Amino acid sequence: LIAPSMERELRAALTEQANEGAIRNFALNLRPLLMQPPVRGHVTMGLDPGYSHGCKVAVVDPTGKVLDTAVVYPTFSKAKRAEAIETLRRLMDRYEVTHIALGNGTASRETEAMVCELLRQKHGAAYMIVSEAGAADYCATPLAAEEFPQYDVNLRSAVSIARRLQDPLAELVKIDPKAIGVGQYQHDVPEKQLDEALSGVVEDCVNAVGVDLNTASPSLLRRVAGLNATTAKNIVAYREEHGAFTARRQVLKVPKLGQRAYEQAAGFLRVPESPQVLDHTGVHPESYAAAETLLGLCGYRLADVGALTELPARLEAYGPARAAEACGIGMPTLRDIVRELCKPGRDPRDELPQPALRTDVLELKDLKPGMVLTGTVRNVIDFGVFVDIGVHQDGLVHISQVCNKFIKHPSEAVSVGDIVRVAVLEVDEKRKRISLTMRGVPGDGETGPDCQKTAR
């Protein structure tokens, strides 16, 4: 009689443990994906490949504004392929496109070959494969229809793909985190627990980067601590009616945004147009007086912010503990203020390696055992790491091949989005499987065989 009861209890405990592990793994992979470095300052072309509906094309300016759209059919015939290449070349010339974001879905192999043929004629441009996970779901939502009422659902996905290269965080926050597809067993775990864990990760990432109060979308603003969907929409509506914000405190005039919400959100909101230089930084308004006092103690003024290269040395000479006491703050707050004053408006993503751009394509048949390649980590799961090496089929680095010493989980060595060097172990063309190793492969400053994980 007791055996079935014990079995149920044990099974329930193991299921709970497995659920927690799957949720933890998803959250662990989601953070580096959201924190991928943006590719700023470039006119970008987004391509959403397809067969029957064609390849959707969108050109966006450096701010993400749509400049032009088109639909080409490179898979229909040789004539249509030539016509597609000419259309893309004409768009690239007209808008001076330097970067192409190519979705990794249906027909991406044929489209990539076309892009490479185009880039042989257009020197100076490069492309990158971008995950289009969740793009189709987003483009059919009321949010996408509100943002792009004049565009067809299919064209919206091309815009989303282009923007994912320019600023992954700003675009991915519009998508349900579960649809991004960087976990394992996400459809088998309790949905409520998964939602709570992933929402927390998204909010942490948005708050770590900060948002520009005058350019942020409602999707981005609602992820800021203290704000919600209603106040985010009200901020955008106020901005459209009254023009750009010129001070942080001006956000208090937004309907339904009270003092308490302001106190929570203020440190994460940036106002580059403000005459108060501290509004450009992550220093909280409550710490403005302390920041000014600190500058005075070190022989600086507010006008010097942005050129405080000697601030850490001067603070060390004065005495950090003494300065903290004089400013009426604790040491952690002092360190935060110094970091923000030295790099006002800093974006932690800029300190990470830039995405790997390509100009040519590899085929599966080109791979040979022993070849050393550079790739991008696409997913980290319990038994290994999937790496995109540019052949339309991610290669697997088994956990035993990640580094030279024993590790309990691949996440101890790599994260989603890391640029890694791998060697080909085996290629099975028939089953389209690629076995890779990172052991003994000379590194390039990233994750080498000693498993020194890059801080994110």
Kindly give the residue locations of the regions a language model identified.
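Long, highly charged, low-complexity intrinsically disordered interaction regions
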Residues: 137, 146-244, 259-295, 329-359, ...
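Short nucleic-acid-contacting surface segments enriched for D/E, G, S/T with interspersed K/R
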Residues: 407-421
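OB-fold (S1/OB) nucleic-acid-binding surfaces
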Residues: 387-403
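Short aromatic-glycine-enriched beta-strand elements
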Residues: 382-387, 394, 432-434
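Extended, charged alpha/beta regions that create polyanion-binding interfaces
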Residues: 1-40, 294-359
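Flexible glycine-rich surface loops and low-complexity tracts that mediate binding to linear polymers
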Residues: 375-378, 417-432
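OB-fold/S1-family single-stranded nucleic acid-binding modules
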Residues: 429-448
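Duplex nucleic acid-engaging cores and interfaces of nucleic-acid transaction enzymes
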Residues: 1-46, 50-151, 158
